[in-house]
Amino acid sequence: MINVQYFARYRETLGLDGESLDWHADMQTLAQLREQLAARGGAWAVLAEQNLMCARNQDLCSLAEPLSDGDDVAFFPTVTGG
């Protein structure tokens, strides 16, 4: 299982705090997970944004980060302000 959490605007857009997904062989990296989620269509396309940030097991990482069964993943937009 992969536990996925959505934060800030992603949570609002998707109407979902998080979900648990079965891990499988075509989910080797965070990029592949993100592609599968965005492919759901509709509001899920928000996860295809260039400025998406992610964390694996509470550590910030790149989308190239390998995924393993039991990981906790978080997706959130970049922080901006003025």
Placement of each model-derived feature along the sequence:
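Ubiquitin-like/PB1-type beta-grasp interaction modules and other compact soluble beta-rich domains
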Residues: 1-81
